[in-house]
Design a protein with these regions (language model features):
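Beta-rich interaction/scaffold domains
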Residues: 7-14, 23-171, 668-671
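Secondary-structure capping and domain/repeat boundary segments
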Residues: 89-103, 114, 596-677
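Extracellular interaction modules
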Residues: 111-112, 140-146, 157-159, 193-195, ...
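Short, well-structured beta-strand/strand-turn elements
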Residues: 124-128, 276-288, 446
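Conserved oxyanion/phosphate-binding beta-strand-loop segments in alpha/beta enzyme cores
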Residues: 196-256, 396
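Short, conserved helix/loop micro-motifs enriched in His/Cys and acidic residues
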Residues: 228-267, 405-428
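Internal "kinase-insert"/substrate-recognition segments embedded within catalytic cores
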Residues: 241-242, 278-282, 295-437
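Middle-to-C-terminal accessory/interaction subdomains
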Residues: 381-451, 458-459, 464-601, 668, ...
């Protein structure tokens, strides 16, 4: 029943709003000023250290569940809950308080124009603008522009809450509401491997319920992103469910986009993959996520990469293993490996009559490969893990490893023909899918391209005897959103997916094959370029308009900036940079691939690893000489030299790719720079 006193105060509030509306921008400035704070970059070391340690450092960070959570994700507050009138009435929204003390109700977009019902509060009531609001009372015509005075009585003064209260409404996005059986996320966020059962309710953008059911498990996911306070999750439902027409599945991922302040890069790159015609591109939808009634932010709900009819539609060789072994028995199986550790498998005693497929492979970092059950390392040093079958037999691993080795040996030959089998490289791979994969990674200048989260699949021979590239996955550090070195954030340059310290030579070799290159250029001009043009001609602006309010709520909810890749504080500037990078990248690729301009890479190597790559137009001179460090380990930097001892010269034009190595001279104790005491 509605409280009459509150109705009177709202009438007075309407008068005040005429004055306050004019001051709306001031309120926004105050909110922004309150949430700005020192950026925490100690989560991972500086960019230079990141280059020295590489992605293995990220792996170590990802496996450190004890990292301090600075986001006030579990701030102890009086439990005050709101529900909505009409559609979405089952959804409950809890009160949240920032580090500065301001309180918020983060409301879904479909709550606009609806009454807000006080569902529960300590003692049965709260005070808003000094007027008592009881459980069951309805709040109407709430303003987003106003800071309300909230008082929640406690048993004593120290337990009482008195603070400013702001109501924020999200964009018109669907809402996913999860609950854990314990009512807490403590167990799940303690360790990525922990999981808990619970419930799941999905609402569309109008508040209509699309699904309600049980979740078999809710758990963490991701690698370096798991180290952030805003964590990515994976849910597994108790039944196959079709979300948004994506196809039926039990397992779904919730990407936090923790490194991407625009929250658009994954969505944009997956769209590029679809335009190129790739198979099995994961579908996704931006949602507002609530867990145990608490707003958790803006997430990208997407399919999990999997082998089945709705995913990667190849034969599932894991089914035989699952019919023989229980899940508990599978957990007890230990991997076995050969002497040099380049091939490993699981002794199940099973292989099946046809071992030609299907296989789902992931090219991975060496550190992550070591923790996987099945996989192999090629002679070229590429580590592949078997994601399906996960419990691969020795016979299966040897078959797929030998086939991949033959392919990589073939592309190293100038004519692309394997010296022993006589097969052309195109007999080992579906060339179009590899071109699509290359374009997705190169156009977006993905720092992780070809390094990790890089999938390939091989159907059984009766379907195809070739490897296919894909599905594509994980694109939060693309389009310049990575400052670990001076390569990824530069829109100029052809990476060939080998600019990373742990990169692969596969696409370097393919890029050098005339038939591959010509088909790649044609696909870029006909499919990739129109998509980039559409992004810049308004598509990005449309995406921003659809999610801006949600992004603003997300930014306030996760108020302390810990994203090591964040360069700008304002959301609009992050979007401007994204559009800037895409435009500059498109223009550069057009010059090289369509207009025939020639560019060359100057590689600068420090301690055996590429430290920096400078891309120079043919015939031009470099701008300056990069300096890695004046002193390193008691040695003085003496300059850059080729393997033959020729020094780097910024006054000489560049006509070809070149590589220079850092030269150091060890200093005596008297010559070493003195450190400050």
């Amino acid at each position: 029943m509605e409280n009459k006193k509150f109705a009177r105060i709202l009438a007075l509030t309407d008068i005040f709003l005429l004055v306050l509306l004019a001051g709306g921008p001031v309120l926004k400035e105050k909110i922004e000023e309150a949430r700005k704070r020192e950026i925490y970059l100690e989560q991972e070391q500086s960019r230079e250290e990141g280059q020295e340690n590489g992605p293995e450092r990220e792996e170590a960070d990802a496996e450190s569940p004890g990292q301090e959570n600075r986001k006030s994700a579990h701030r102890e507050l009086p439990e005050v809950l709101l529900t909505l009138e009409g559609e979405g009435e089952q959804l409950k929204i809890s009160l949240w308080q920032s580090n500065e003390g301001s309180c918020y109700f983060f409301l879904p977009g479909f709550a606009k124009g609806k009454g807000l019902i006080l569902d529960s509060a300590p003692g049965g009531s709260v005070y808003l603008e000094n007027m008592e609001i009881k459980e069951g009372d309805v709040l109407r015509e709430i303003s987003e522009e106003k800071v309300y005075e909230l008082s929640v009585p406690g048993e004593n003064e120290t337990e009482s809450l008195n603070a400013g209260l702001i109501f924020m409404y999200s964009s018109e996005l669907p809402v996913l509401s999860l609950s854990t059986n314990s009512g807490s996320m403590e167990l799940i966020e303690e360790d990525k491997g922990n999981e808990e059962a619970g419930g799941a309710v999905l609402y569309d953008q109008m508040g209509a319920k699309l699904y309600e059911g049980q979740a078999e498990s809710i758990k963490g996911r991701g690698n370096s992103t798991w180290g952030l306070a805003k964590k990515p999750y994976q849910i597994r439902l108790c039944e196959d469910v079709d979300f948004f027409g994506f196809g039926k599945a039990k397992a779904w991922n919730l990407l936090a986009n923790g490194y991407d302040e625009t929250r658009l890069r994954n969505q944009i790159v997956l769209g590029l993959a679809r335009e190129l015609g790739m198979n099995y591109v994961p579908e996704g939808q931006m949602v507002d996520l609530y867990i145990n009634d608490s707003y958790r932010g803006n997430y990208y709900l997407t399919e999990k990469i999997r082998v089945d009819e709705g995913g990667v539609a190849i034969r599932d060789m894991e089914k035989l293993t699952e019919t023989v072994y229980s899940p508990e028995e599978l957990e007890m199986l230990e991997p076995v490996q050969n002497e040099d550790g380049t091939r490993k498998w699981v002794e199940t005693g099973l292989s099946g009559e046809d071992i030609t497929g299907g296989y789902l492979l992931e090219r991975e970092l060496k550190s992550r490969f070591q923790t996987e059950l099945s996989g192999f390392v090629t002679d070229q040093g590429d580590c592949y893990t078997l994601q399906s079958p996960l419990y691969a037999s020795e016979e299966q691993v040897n078959y797929i490893a030998d086939l991949m080795q033959e392919f990589q040996d073939a592309i190293e030959e100038k004519d692309g023909i394997h010296p022993l089998t006589g097969k052309h490289y195109s007999e080992y791979i579906d060339v179009d899918s590899f071109i699509q994969k290359y374009l997705v990674e190169e156009v977006s200048k993905n720092y992780d391209g070809g390094v990790t989260s890089s999938f390939f699949y091989k159907p059984q021979d009766s379907v195809s005897k070739k490897f296919f590239a894909g599905p594509v996955w994980d694109y939060d550090v693309v389009f310049g959103n990575c400052n670990l070195d001076k390569i990824a954030s530069n829109p100029v340059g052809i990476t060939r997916l080998n600019d990373h310290v742990y990169g692969t030579d596969v696409f370097v070799e393919l890029y050098g094959k005339e038939d591959f290159y010509d088909r790649m250029i044609k696909m870029y001009e006909e499919k990739a370029l129109p998509y980039l043009n559409a992004l810049l001609d308004g598509k990005i602006d449309e995406m921003v308009a659809e999610s801006r309010n949600s992004a603003e709520m997300d930014s306030i909810r996760w108020e302390e900036l810990e994203n090591r890749y964040q360069y700008y504080e304002e959301y609009d500037n992050d979007v401007r940079y994204l559009k800037y990078f895409i435009k500059e990248r498109r223009d550069f690729l057009n010059k090289v691939w369509l207009e025939g301009e020639s560019y060359h890479n100057i590689n600068f190597v420090v301690d055996g690893e590429i430290w920096q790559i400078t891309c120079i137009r043919d015939g031009e001179t470099p701008d300056a000489e990069p300096i890695p460090a004046r002193y390193s380990g008691g040695s003085l930097f003496m300059g850059w030299f080729t393997e033959d001892g020729v020094p780097y010269d910024i006054y000489k034009p560049v006509y070809e790719d070149m590589t220079f190595y850092a030269s150091w001279q060890e200093l005596s104790a008297l010559e070493k720079p003195q450190e400050d005491s």
